Every structure is written in structure tokens, then in C-alpha cells.
């Protein structure tokens, strides 16, 4: 089993969606080989030229792309391991939470770390990243991140749904971590690896939760060094 993942200039694995899969694999006690690539390698990855995204899992000749599809596949392919995505309404709720993470956590973090993220990338990836993100945001990389010190409080406020849950329990999944935790963890790990900017206050319960997540599975998250 091979996980295809992005690396930055320091060799760090920074993709938030890949971290969802990494934590899911650890939760299930599954091991895999990691194939490191840059953004510019993605178009030529598949031997038949099929479109893939990162992360992609290759298992038994099958290529599974997209983090949600990968975790669903792991639940099906390894039924004797702890299930992560549930069934029926549980799955629908997880998909709702994934959408919230994408539109609130990831979107908010992107505007706090964008220039730092660009600087951290492989030199061969920087031009592509700049052009694609500036086209999406209709602003320069520098403009996207500018004024973050004045905007970070609004980001903190947007995390109130997480904060309220974590005031009553150590993980979003309750006493033990669940895939909901890994969905949210990926974004904060993305920021930790890509930028020295403090996106959370140390006295925030969300910060304490993130530290607990970093310690899971023998410190899997901490093995990737933080940005300096």
C-alpha cells in the first residue's frame, strides 16, 4: 500500500487532506509506504494518464484519490479494523463536518499562512502555486496574507463550535479521537508545518486539543517538524 503525498522544501508533509489519511491509517493500525512528490509531479503520476489529486492511495493495483474516498475505501478493504466513516446518518454528519472544516478552518487558515506556505514549497512548485492561488483569490499571495495580525481574532471566533465541544470532552469524538478529529487536525497541522505564525492562542481549548492530537499514535504528528 502506497500513499502519494506532497513535500515542501524541507521534506515536510504539509497537505491537510493527506494528514486526514495519515491519522486514519494510524487509527486503524495500518502501515503504508509513502511516495514523496511535488505539485509539478501530479499531472504525470498515473501510468494511464488518469487525473489524480493528493492524497492518492495505491493498493492492490487500485488508485484511490481524494481523502474521503480513501478513508471510505479503507473501511471497506479492512473491515476488521476500527471503522471511521460510519453508515447512514453518521456518514452524512461527517460529510457535513468535513464541509465545515473546508469552508471555515481551511479557508480561514489559508488567509493567515498563504505567503509563508508559498515560501516553504519546493522551488519548482512556487510559480505554479502562486499563479493558481492568485487566480482563485483574485489577489497576490502577499495581499492574501497581509494584515493577518488584525484578522486572526476573527478566525478564533469562527472556531466556537469546536471550542464548545472541546470544553466538555478531550476530543471531538468524545473520550477518544474519531475521524472528525482527523478532519479538523489536518488543517492545523498544515499551518504548523508551513508557517511560524501562531494561529491559536495557547490558552485556547482548541490549542490543547491540537496538542493532544499531535501526541496520538506515538507522536505521529510531531514527527513532522514545525515551521521555523
Question: What do these predicted ranges mean?
Answer:
Residues 171, 219-223:
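Intrinsically disordered or highly flexible coil/loop and linker segments, enriched in small
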Residues 29-31, 217-220:
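Structural alpha-beta junctions
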Residues 227-228:
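Eukaryotic N-terminal low-complexity, Ser/Thr- and Lys/Arg-rich leader segments
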Residues 1-128:
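GST-like domain detector, emphasizing the conserved glutathione-binding G-site
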Residues 101-211:
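GST-like fold's C-terminal all-alpha helical module
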Residues 209-219:
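Short, flexible loop segments at boundaries between secondary-structure elements
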Amino acid at each position: 500500500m502506497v500513499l502519494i503525498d506532497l513535500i515542501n522544501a524541507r521534506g515536510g508533509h504539509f497537505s491537510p487532506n493527506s494528514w486526514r489519511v495519515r491519522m486514519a491509517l494510524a487509527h486503524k493500525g495500518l502501515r503504508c509506504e509513502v511516495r514523496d512528490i511535488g505539485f509539478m509531479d501530479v499531472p504525470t503520476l498515473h501510468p494511464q494518464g488518469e487525473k489524480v489529486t493528493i492524497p492518492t492511495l495505491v493498493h492492490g493495483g487500485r488508485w484511490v484519490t481524494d481523502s474521503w474516498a480513501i478513508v471510505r475505501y479503507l473501511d471497506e478493504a479492512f473491515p476488521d479494523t476500527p471503522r471511521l466513516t460510519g453508515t447512514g446518518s453518521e456518514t452524512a454528519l461527517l460529510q457535513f463536518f468535513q464541509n465545515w472544516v473546508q469552508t471555515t478552518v481551511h479557508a480561514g487558515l489559508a488567509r493567515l499562512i498563504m505567503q509563508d506556505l508559498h515560501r516553504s514549497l519546493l522551488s519548482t512548485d512556487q510559480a505554479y502555486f502562486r499563479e493558481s492561488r492568485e487566480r482563485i483569490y483574485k489577489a497576490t499571495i502577499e495581499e492574501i496574507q497581509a494584515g493577518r495580525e488584525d484578522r486572526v481574532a476573527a478566525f478564533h471566533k469562527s472556531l466556537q463550535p469546536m471550542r464548545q465541544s472541546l470544553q466538555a470532552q478531550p476530543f471531538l469524538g468524545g473520550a477518544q479521537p474519531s475521524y472528525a478529529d482527523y478532519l479538523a487536525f489536518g488543517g492545523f497541522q498544515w499551518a504548523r508545518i508551513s508557517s511560524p505564525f501562531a494561529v491559536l492562542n495557547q490558552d485556547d481549548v482548541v490549542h490543547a486539543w491540537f496538542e493532544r492530537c499531535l501526541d496520538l499514535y506515538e507522536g505521529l504528528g510531531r514527527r513532522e517538524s514545525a515551521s521555523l
